[in-house]
Amino acid sequence: PASHHDFGKNIIPANIERSRVFAFPFKDENRKRDAYWRDVGTLDAYYDANMDLVSIDPQLNLYDSAWPIRTHQPNLPPPKFVFGTQGDGERTGAAIDSIVCSGTIVSGGRVQHSVLGPSVRVNSYAHVSDSILFEGVQVGRHARIRRAIIDKHVQIPAGFEIGYDLEKDRARGFTISPGGIVTIAKTEDLSAVSASESLTSALSEGGIRQPFLHRSNPGVPNAGTRSQDTT
């Protein structure tokens, strides 16, 4: 429980104490850069490391065949981008300056400068920018996400906004990093948050009336009410 699960603070020191540890100088004089190492122990550092991946010349080039990434490859189809309706420029499935993993479908939504994990779904008219979406995240129609980290399988309701009003996000109980990155945990039920906000908005605007009955004449039932059957 006392561990931060951090390489520098916990993992490497613990291994040095109980095992024989050897250092390897990851440096190749024939390469233009030293080997990649980056501390991602904070939300802001993790966010910056991911945003670097989508830059034109990232420090860690995932597409460098001379330095392959050995990892599990899920058995999923390639990403798909659908809807490019003429005359409706907003409904165009597109991803720009982004990394999109297998199984993801951008269906009439727009993704900019973001990293999308496997099996993400971005629905029509939604806009995702400068964000990291983990596996299985579902983004509803007209939703807007900016400078956020969304954990696995979170469902973003239609029209929901994240990252556009930090005070509102903070009031929702979301974690916000010192750099202003909004983080949504996989346990968050955003549908309940959306429903609560919609109800509060309707009440403040007088759009919902209290369900009570009023009779101006005790002898005559009001229109729309049901009188008791005495037969």
Where are these regions (language model features)?
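Left-handed beta-helix
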Residues: 1-231
